[in-house]
């Protein structure tokens, strides 16, 4: 019997994502000038106000307010009518030095023995539903949000768009877990009051009709241009569209809802598929295994599925604070393995093939680069691995331009080694 499964995404202008991007922009600025910096930076955004909190250990001084304003403006909050804009919002900073007790557990005389920054369990997941080994429901929801933001920033079509928006995609699966079709697309987008009645009042019905028409005739066709034939085949004439189903959406962003770093962890990962250990990513440097081990387990799961070990795989790793070696490694192939091995045997093989000590993960995935701002919107997983040039400026330092490799955990450079190890 078929079943339905849904995933959601949010835009870069969603309040929680504004907070995530501020936190990761600050992290990148520290790493650009001090690649040994330890950071745990939280941001809070509301009407006309940003609060930046957390713990940092670094030899460098960073202008937090300038980075926050630059980030907010880049997202698109540049107008006073939004009641939250980068040029005029108040910014309060409450950053203090990382605890000596925590630092003592992380730092070691030998880098290889660097302990985990905290206890906890982290998960990585991959499946063969899409070319980037992500759940198709989340992949589509993320792409809808990214494409809508591109349209907004181009300023040629749908010129009424404002930065805050959300999407949700529901997929019908067969009883053997194969995507069959798109059942429902939900989209809520912030917008201007752009149609008036003859008496000067807002014409809500006309605005909503226009937004729905543009979503179906402008946004969705552009989304389709980025899709493989396999995913395109899921579109059909019976898709249910819910566009701004509560009515007009003019008040939004941090003025409409308070935003906080780390509140979109399912959007950041697998859209409800797989599992999540509960630890957020943004604002944390790679000594925090909440982040680095989640990337490492994604790297493992993706390469394993790409190598043909299984059609779907979940990898869990756990740590004790201050201890380098993982406490446990767990694998679940959901009965979709292609090798004559129990999942526990696959887990043992992974432990032999991959070094999951925090310092080894940092080195393998190059996590001491200022590479994190790009992860803070539209998902940390399933993104394009590429080298980009980034420039960092500061009133306290000379401008610094450097090449940075993004999304290193999305590389498929272990496939041949895995095939050989598993006899595939």
Residue ranges of model-derived segments:
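N-terminal, positively charged regions that mediate nucleic acid binding
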Residues: 1-40, 155, 415, 421
């Amino acid at each position: 019997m078929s079943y339905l499964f849904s995933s959601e995404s949010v835009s870069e202008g969603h309040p929680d994502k504004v907070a995530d991007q501020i936190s990761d922009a600050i992290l990148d600025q520290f790493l650009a000038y001090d690649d040994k910096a330890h950071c745990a930076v939280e941001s809070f955004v509301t009407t006309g106000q940003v609060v930046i909190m957390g713990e940092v250990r670094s030899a460098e001084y960073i202008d937090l307010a300038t980075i926050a304003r630059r980030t907010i403006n880049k997202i698109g909050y540049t107008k006073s009518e939004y009641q939250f804009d980068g040029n005029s919002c108040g910014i309060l900073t409450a950053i203090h030095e990382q605890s000596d007790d925590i630092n003592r557990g992380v730092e070691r005389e030998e880098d290889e023995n660097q302990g985990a920054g905290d206890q906890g369990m982290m998960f990585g997941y991959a499946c063969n539903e899409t070319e980037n080994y992500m759940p198709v429901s989340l992949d589509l929801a993320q792409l809808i949000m990214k494409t809508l933001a591109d349209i907004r920033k181009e300023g040629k079509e749908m010129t009424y768009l404002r930065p805050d928006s959300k999407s949700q995609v529901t997929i019908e699966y067969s009883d053997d877990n194969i995507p069959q079709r798109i059942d429902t697309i939900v989209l809520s987008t912030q917008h201007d009051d752009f149609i008036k009645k003859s008496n000067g009042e807002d014409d809500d019905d006309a605005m909503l009709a226009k937004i729905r028409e543009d979503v179906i005739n402008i946004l969705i066709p552009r989304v389709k241009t980025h899709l493989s034939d396999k995913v395109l085949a899921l579109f059909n004439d019976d898709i249910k569209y819910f566009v701004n189903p509560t009515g007009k959406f003019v008040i939004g962003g941090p003025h409409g809802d308070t935003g906080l770093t780390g509140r979109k962890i399912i959007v950041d990962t697998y859209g409800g598929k797989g599992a999540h250990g509960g630890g957020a990513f943004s604002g944390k440097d790679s000594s925090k295994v909440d982040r680095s081990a989640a990337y490492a387990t994604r790297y493992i799961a993706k390469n394993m599925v790409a190598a043909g070990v299984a059609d779907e795989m979940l990898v869990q790793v756990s740590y004790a604070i201050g201890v380098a070696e993982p406490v446990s490694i767990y694998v679940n192939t959901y009965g979709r393995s292609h090798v004559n091995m129990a999942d526990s045997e696959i887990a043992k093989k992974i432990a032999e093939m991959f070094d999951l000590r925090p310092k080894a993960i940092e080195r393998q995935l190059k996590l001491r680069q200022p590479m994190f701002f790009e992860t803070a919107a539209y998902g940390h997983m399933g993104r394009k691995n590429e080298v980009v040039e980034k420039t960092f400026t500061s009133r306290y330092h000379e401008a610094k331009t450097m090449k940075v490799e993004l999304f290193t955990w999305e590389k498929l450079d272990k496939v041949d080694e895995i095939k050989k190890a598993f006899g595939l």
